[in-house]
């Protein structure tokens, strides 16, 4: 979902960076994902996310890692895409640091509160 945005940034030589949180840790959701979408490897890879079993634990590791990157890079805008815990952590980290947040896929709803993603969409 962010691949077209990344391609356009690259085409226009706009400064940007990609953070891979490791939330999806199978080979089909990692290196293959970047290859299939014709994306270069991400500049940043967080570790330890897959080691956490709970949503809270994963989100905490991502929040801490993303915050560290944002403090180092200080972008004017941080884009997130989707409804996974990665996006919740990224948006929260950026907002707490007074960095603008852009959300690709904002407004999508299922109204199924049994899904963790629905909670992330609303927050």
What are the residue ranges of the model-derived segments?
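Non-catalytic terminal and connector segments of soluble metabolic enzymes
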Residues: 11-14, 39, 43
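Short internal beta-strands
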Residues: 15-23
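Active-site and donor-binding regions of nucleotide-sugar-utilizing enzymes
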Residues: 1-10, 32-33, 45-123
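N-terminal beta-loop-helix "entrance" segment that forms/cooperates
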Residues: 22-40
């Amino acid at each position: 979902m962010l691949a077209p945005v990344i391609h356009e940034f690259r085409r226009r030589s706009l400064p940007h960076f990609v953070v891979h949180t490791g939330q999806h840790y199978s080979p089909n959701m990692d290196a293959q994902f970047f290859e299939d979408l014709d994306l270069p490897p991400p500049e940043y890879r967080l570790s330890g996310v897959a080691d956490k079993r709970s949503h809270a634990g994963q989100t905490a590791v991502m929040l801490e890692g993303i915050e560290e990157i944002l403090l180092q890079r200080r972008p004017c805008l941080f884009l997130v895409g989707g409804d996974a815990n990665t996006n919740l952590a990224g948006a929260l980290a950026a907002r707490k640091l007074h960095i603008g947040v852009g959300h690709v896929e904002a407004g999508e709803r299922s109204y199924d509160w049994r899904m963790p993603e629905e909670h992330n969409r609303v927050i």
